[in-house]
Every structure is written in C-alpha cells, then in structure tokens.
Amino acid sequence: MARISGVDLPKKKRIEYGLTYVYGIGLHASRKILDATGIDYNKRVYELNEDDIAAITKEIRASHVVEGDLRKQVAMDIKALMDLGSYRGLRHRRGLPCRGQKTKTNARTRKGKRKTVGAA
C-alpha cells in the first residue's frame, strides 16, 4: 500500500483517483501532479514502484499544501475572520451559515439540534 503525505492510498484504484484521498488534492491537482512526474493516469496504486512514489511525494511537497498544514491554514483563516469582526467571522462565531442562506427554517447542519424555546 502506497503511503503519501501520511495517507494510505487504496491499492486497487487508479492513481489519479487514489491521490484524491489526500486532503487538499482533488482530481485536477492530481492530474497536474501526475503530468509533472510523467506517471500514467491509468496506472493502479499497487503498480507504482518506490521511484514513482518518491517523485509524487517530492512534487506534492514542492507545489501543494496538504493534510495537516492545509487544515491549520484554513483554521487560521477562519480565526482571522473572527478576530477582524467581519460579517463572515461573526457568522462563524455564531455557528450560522456564512454564504447568505436563509436560516428561518433550514440550516440545521450549521445550527445543530433544535432547542425548543417557550411553552411553559
């Protein structure tokens, strides 16, 4: 099993889809990485040799922010919005949607379980 950026890639998948299991790498980025390293998209993960894995790892380290570093960066960006006091930061702080959705009836995912108010 190939291990790239701390993630075990599924053996039987094609490498272009296997790389998407790494947080921060989608299909487009996966194809760019494979183009840069010269590895065929249709190759399966179990068919990769050590040189291929090393080349992919080197390319990812050189040109992509992935896994823990990316999660940390996203968290810091959200924290910066909250510290600024921007509208998006306030919505994050209150646990409400940031992108303009209505909240009168929906938004249960962001708001969490219902809290009944009133009726004595």
From Swiss-Prot:
Gene3D superfamilies: 1.10.8.50, 30s ribosomal protein s13, domain 2 (4.10.910.10). GO terms for cellular component: cytosol; small ribosomal subunit. The keyword tRNA-binding applies. It comes from the Bacteria. Keywords: Ribonucleoprotein, Ribosomal protein, RNA-binding, rRNA-binding, tRNA-binding. Residues 93-120 are annotated as: Disordered. GO terms for biological process: translation. SUPFAM superfamilies: S13-like H2TH domain. Pfam families: Ribosomal_S13. InterPro entries: Rbsml_uS13_C, Ribosomal_uS13, Ribosomal_uS13-like_H2TH, Ribosomal_uS13_bac-type, Ribosomal_uS13_CS. Located at the top of the head of the 30S subunit, it contacts several helices of the 16S rRNA. In the 70S ribosome it contacts the 23S rRNA (bridge B1a) and protein L5 of the 50S subunit (bridge B1b), connecting the 2 subunits; these bridges are implicated in subunit movement. Contacts the tRNAs in the A and P-sites. PANTHER family: 30S RIBOSOMAL PROTEIN S13/40S RIBOSOMAL PROTEIN S18, SMALL RIBOSOMAL SUBUNIT PROTEIN US13M. Part of the 30S ribosomal subunit. Forms a loose heterodimer with protein S19. Forms two bridges to the 50S subunit in the 70S ribosome. This is Small ribosomal subunit protein uS13. It comes from Sulfurimonas denitrificans (strain ATCC 33889 / DSM 1251).
